[in-house]
């Protein structure tokens, strides 16, 4: 449901390399990112570069991840949301099992709108689902319907989370805080994770709530984290929560170390700052000043001191009635994005694109997740000679030890060499979160 490396400005990565041709068009392939962070970051930074047509081709392993990426991108692009409002909606939906009531109401309303995209009922110029078959489009529509209904009915996502934790820890469940503290101090701290506090990490491991603020209590379930959603008659079946319960969503936006006036910010504060900056830059094409960021921040939350309690069961189980959200089909809620478009491809494309001549040597840049590296032989034919290929490393995976990190890098080097990739720079398994190659 999220990635394990920071958001990247793709144009910056391309421009840094002299091996790549800097043309008027940039064709990008993103495989298994788990979220839309690289697209958001690149959109935000576009004003820093000359005009260029950028097409993002995205392959995710599940339709739920496609739907979440659509929702998160839509939140960044929605023109009627306040800056802080959009930022916190994004982070809560992205990384929390429970969200504030205001966020839940937004999720209900927005899911109702997004379910019309797969059916082409509303025009969404920045997004294309044309490569999906009718069956997959129907499933996407069903996922949005499920989110709308499940948010109102407040399905017990925290219970699903606890069941996963119990199954994972078994006899160690009663001593879980000790397990979480050990993972934090002995693993994460040794890998240069600076702004993530032990309080944030422990609270997330216990309850699945990563990002918290003083204002508002997270009391409504976030069904966008539920896996394998299938419409069945008038209702739905799903596999509860099957996602990450050990690493966390902190490393995509909240891993940069920042100190101001000797105050050390939490991962939540860094993530809020980075998302706020990205949304502001997408909207205004201007940098965000630090004073504006500071105006949204309460000084009492510095130094990782903020702790929250879980809401009462009665509050969590309260149900909402369905109210059909009325909006005009020609009322476009998103800001106009010129020269950039996101095209989603089905997961079967991992095997089929190499057989289509129009995709041979098509891409100038490829980013691939750490758990998709076995697909490199299928994907390398799709990139141009001299293209940049970035591969996510496993630095932030808590369950892996240093030996595992080194073995992964060794295997990655072997796969790369066999498929015509050369390292742009040396790879340090413990320090680096990304490996950089080019196609020779």
Features from the language model and the residues they span:
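Domain-level detector for long C-terminal conserved domains
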Residues: 1-440
């Amino acid at each position: 449901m999220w990635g394990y490396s920071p958001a990247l400005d793709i144009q910056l990565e391309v421009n840094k390399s002299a091996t790549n041709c800097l043309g008027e068009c940039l064709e990008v392939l993103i495989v298994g990112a788990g979220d839309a962070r690289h697209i958001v970051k690149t959109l935000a930074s576009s004003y820093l570069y000359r005009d260029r047509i950028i097409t993002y081709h995205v392959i995710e392993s599940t339709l739920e991840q496609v739907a979440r990426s659509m929702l998160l991108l839509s939140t960044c692009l929605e023109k009627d949301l306040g800056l802080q409002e959009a930022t916190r909606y994004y982070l809560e939906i992205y990384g929390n099992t429970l969200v504030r009531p205001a966020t839940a109401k937004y999720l209900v309303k927005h899911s109702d709108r997004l379910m019309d995209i797969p059916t082409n009922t509303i025009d969404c110029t920045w997004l294309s689902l044309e490569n999906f078959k009718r069956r997959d489009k129907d499933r996407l529509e069903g996922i949005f319907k499920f989110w709308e209904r499940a948010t109102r009915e407040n399905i017990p996502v925290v219970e699903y989370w606890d069941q996963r934790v119990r199954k994972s820890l078994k006899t160690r469940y009663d001593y879980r805080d000790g397990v979480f503290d050990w993972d934090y101090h002995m693993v994460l701290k040794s890998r240069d994770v600076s702004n993530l506090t032990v309080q944030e990490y422990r609270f997330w491991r216990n309850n699945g709530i990563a990002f918290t603020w003083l204002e508002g209590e997270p009391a409504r379930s976030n069904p966008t984290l539920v896996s394998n959603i299938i419409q069945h008659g008038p209702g739905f079946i799903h596999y509860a929560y099957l996602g990450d319960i050990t690493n966390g969503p902190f490393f995509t936006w909240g891993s940069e170390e920042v100190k101001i006036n000797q105050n050390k910010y939490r991962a939540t504060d860094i993530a809020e700052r980075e998302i706020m900056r990205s949304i502001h830059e997408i909207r205004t094409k201007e940098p965000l000043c630090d004073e504006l960021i500071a105006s949204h921040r309460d000084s009492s939350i510095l130094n990782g001191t903020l702790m929250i309690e879980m809401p009462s069961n009665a509050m969590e189980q309260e149900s909402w009635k369905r109210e059909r959200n009325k909006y005009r089909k020609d009322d476009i809620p998103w800001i106009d994005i010129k020269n950039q478009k996101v095209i989603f491809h089905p997961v079967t494309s991992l095997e089929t694109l190499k057989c289509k001549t129009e995709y041979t040597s098509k891409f100038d840049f490829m980013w691939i997740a750490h758990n998709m590296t076995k697909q490199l032989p299928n994907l390398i034919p799709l990139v141009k000679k001299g293209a940049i290929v970035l591969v996510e490393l496993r630095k932030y995976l808590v369950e892996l030890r240093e030996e595992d990190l080194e073995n992964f890098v060794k295997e990655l080097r072997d796969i790369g060499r066999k498929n015509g990739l050369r390292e742009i720079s040396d790879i340090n398994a413990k320090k680096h979160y990304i490996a950089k190659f080019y196609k020779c």
